[in-house]
């Protein structure tokens, strides 16, 4: 048998033996639904039927924004949890300890009012940036490590959109 054929057979065997992706996430939760396919399932096994009755909170973090509550899915990537609040604030927290790494507050105009409430649906994290949609129809990109604003763009005039 030729060397190329043996190599091909080994590659095919290794590929066939690889487990199929079940849609579960690892320690990270990088998207709204966990994975890009929104499986909303974690493969972590620290919490199970034998210990679920004994678990207790590891840490707590108060954002200070209580109007409307949090209506977001925390994003966890590389040990950092990213959350946003109803008043356009973004926090980066150490996911293991809850220690705040940085905070960003988007400056809403004082005269700004909204018909639909002050809710924010969360952030997206990719390419070294944290992206947030704001109440006045901007998209803001923040540096993932520092929380400094990198850029912002106005998507729609908040007074014209009927919001």
Where are these regions (language model features)?
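Residue-level detector of Asp-centered blade-edge/turn motifs that repeat once per structural unit
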Residues: 76-78, 125-127
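Blade/loop signatures of beta-propeller domains
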Residues: 21-57
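Short loop/turn segments that connect beta-strands within beta-propeller blades
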Residues: 94-97, 143-146
């Amino acid at each position: 048998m030729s060397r190329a054929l043996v190599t091909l057979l080994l590659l095919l065997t290794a590929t066939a033996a690889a487990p199929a992706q079940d849609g579960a996430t690892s320690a990270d939760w990088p998207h709204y639904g966990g994975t890009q396919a929104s499986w909303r399932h974690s493969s972590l096994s620290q919490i199970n039927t034998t210990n679920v009755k004994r678990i207790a909170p590891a840490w707590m973090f108060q954002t200070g924004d209580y109007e409307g509550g949090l209506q977001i899915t925390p994003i966890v990537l590389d040990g950092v949890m990213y959350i946003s609040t109803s008043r356009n604030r973004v926090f980066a927290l150490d996911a293991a300890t809850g220690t705040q790494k940085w905070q960003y507050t988007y400056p809403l105009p004082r005269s700004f009012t909204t018909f639909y409430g002050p809710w924010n649906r969360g952030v997206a994290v990719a390419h070294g940036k944290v992206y947030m949609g704001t109440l006045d129809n901007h998209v803001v990109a923040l540096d993932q490590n520092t929380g400094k604003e990198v850029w912002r763009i106005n998507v729609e005039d908040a007074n014209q959109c009927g919001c």
